[in-house]
C-alpha cells in the first residue's frame, strides 16, 4: 500500500515537475523549501484564524454568561427588597399610629444593613405618620423632596402583594447623597396607607464596577436611563435594536460590538429592566492578540529553522557537488588545468583532494605515455641502423604505446563512470557508489573518499528522517495527552459546576433559614418587649400601690376637713341663691328696657315710612335698633332660664352636700379598711414584680441568643454566597483551561503535520537503508528543493 502510494506520488511529481528541475538537485531542494514554507505559513494562518474565531466566541460567551449572572443578582436583590417591604407592611401594628412607630423601629434593627429607613405614609392626610427618621415623622409629603412622596402604590383587594419601586435611584440626604432606591407596599385593611422602605444601592454599584478593568455593567429602565446611578450617562443609541430584541424576548440574550466595545445584553428578572455589560475590545480580545503573536512567532521560528537547515545542506552539499561535477566534466574533456583546491577537511574536502590526486596522476600517465612515444620514435630512428634491434625496439615501443593508450582509455572510462555516479548523487540518489576496485591508486582514493562522504550524508539524512519521525510520534503523544487533559478538565469543570449548583441551593436554604430566624427573633424580641412592659407595669403598680396607701392615710385626715368645708359650702350656696334672686330682678329690668327699645324702633319705622325716600337712612338705623332690642330681649330670656336652672341645681347641690356630710363618717372607716387592703396588695405586687423581672431578664437573654444565631446564619449565608461565586469562577477557569488544552492539541497536530512534511522532504533522498527495508515507506521524488550558499 505504502509502495503504491509512493510510486503514484513519484510518477505525479515526474509529470508535474519539468526536466530542468528534475535534472538539478539544487532546483528540487529550492522547490521543496518553498513548498514547506507555503505549508507552514498556511498552517500558521489557519491556526491563527481558527484560534481568533474560537477566542472571540469564548470571550463573547463568557461576557454573556457574566452579564446573565449580574442580571440575575440584580433581579434577586430587587425581589428581596420587595419581599422586605411586603412582609413588613403586612403586620397589624401598622394599622394603629401609636403602635406603628415602635414597630418600624424594631423592624429597622432586624432587617439587613442595606435598609436605610422606613416611613409609614397616610395618603389621605398627606403626611408621614411614623418614620425611623425623626426629622421626617409628622411632616407633610409636599414638604419632602423624594420620589416616594408621589408614589402610586396599588391597594385594595388583590393588591396586598404588589410593591411599587422607583424607576431610578436618587440621592438621599440621610446618606450624604449616596444613591438609594425606595420600595412601597400598601397596608392591608387601612385605606390610603402604605409603608416605604428606602434601601442603599452603593454595594450594588460597587459590585458592578471594577477600577482595574474597563468592564462596566449598567442597568437600564424602560426609558433607557441608568437605574443604579442616576448621575451617570449611557448612550444607548447604538444598542437600540439589541435592547428592543431583549425587551421583546426576555429569555434571549445578545452580544454586539460597537464603538470599540463588546456589549452583552439580557433581561433583568422580576423587572422590566435590561442589564448591559461592556468591555473594551482591546481587553476582551487580549488573549486573541497574544495567541496571534504566539502563532506568528512559531511560524517565523519554523521558517528560520528550515532556512538554516536548507542553507546548511545546500551550502555544504549541493554547491560543492555542483562545482566538483563541473571540474570532473573539464577533466573528462581533457582539460587538466582545473582548480580543485578547498579549505574543507570533511568528506567533501577529501573528495576534492582525491579528484585532484586523480587529475595529477592522470596527467602524469599521459605525460609518461607521450614520453614513451617520443622514445619509441627515437629508437625507431636508431633502429634504421640496426634493423633487427630497431624492429625489436619498435615492437617494444609499440607495446609501450599500446599500454599507455590502454591506461589512458581506462582512466577516461573510469572518469566517465565516476561522473555518471556523481550526477546520480547530485540528482538525489544516495545509493550510488564509486567503484573502489581501480588499478590506479589515485582513482581508488577518489572512490574511497567519495563513498565515505556519501555514507556520512546518508547518515545525516537518516538522522533527520528519524528526528522527523520522533517529532511526529512525540507530537502524537502530546496531542493524546492534551486530549486526556481536556477530558479531565471538562470533568473537573462539570464537578465544579455541580459544586456551584449545590452551593447555590445551600445558599437558598440558608437564606430561608435566615428569614425564619428573623421572624423567630422578632417574635422573641416582641415577647421581651412585652415582658419588659409588664415588668414596668408591675413596678408602676407597686409605686402606685404605695402612693395609694399614702393617699388613703391622708384621705382619712382630709375627710374631717371635707366635713367642715361642706358646712361652709352649704352656707355659701345659700348666699349664692340669694344673689341669684337679685340677678333675676336685674334681668327683668333688662327685659323691660328691651321691650321699650323695641317700641322705639317700631315708632322709628313708622316715621321712616312717612318720610318716604328721605327717611331711608333713618329706617336702617331703626331696623338695627329693633334687631338689637330683639337680641337683648332674647339674651335676657336665655340668662333668666339659665339662672333658673342654676337655682334648681343649687338646691340639689345643697341637698347633696348635706347627704355627703352624712356619708363622710362612713367613708372614713371605709378608707381605713381600704388602706389596710392596699398594704396587702402592695406586698403581693412587689412579689409578682420580682418574678416578672426575672422572666423579662430571661426573655432578653433569649432574644440576644436568637439575634446571635441570626447573625451566624447570615454569616454562613454570606460564606455560602462567596463559595458559590468562587465555584463559578473556578468552573469558568476550568473551561478556559479546557479550551487552552484544546488549542495545545491543535498546535500539536499542526506540529505533527509539519514534521510529516519534513519527513516527506527528507525521504526524497534515496539511501541504501531504503533499499534494505522493502516494507518501509520509500522516498518520493517530490518537486521540493532548497537553495543556499
Swiss-Prot record:
Membrane-spanning intervals of the chain: 29-49, 294-314
PTM characteristics: Methylated by CheR.
Boundaries of every Methyl-accepting transducer domain copy: 481-717
UniProt-listed GO biological process terms: chemotaxis; signal transduction
MF terms (GO), sorted A to Z: transmembrane signaling receptor activity
Pfam families: HAMP, MCPsignal
Domain HAMP stretches: 315-367, 409-462
Biased composition (Acidic residues): 772-789
UniProt family annotation: Belongs to the methyl-accepting chemotaxis (MCP) protein family.
Name assigned to this protein: Transducer protein Htr6
Native source organism of the sequence: Halobacterium salinarum (strain ATCC 29341 / DSM 671 / R1)
Gene (name only): htr6
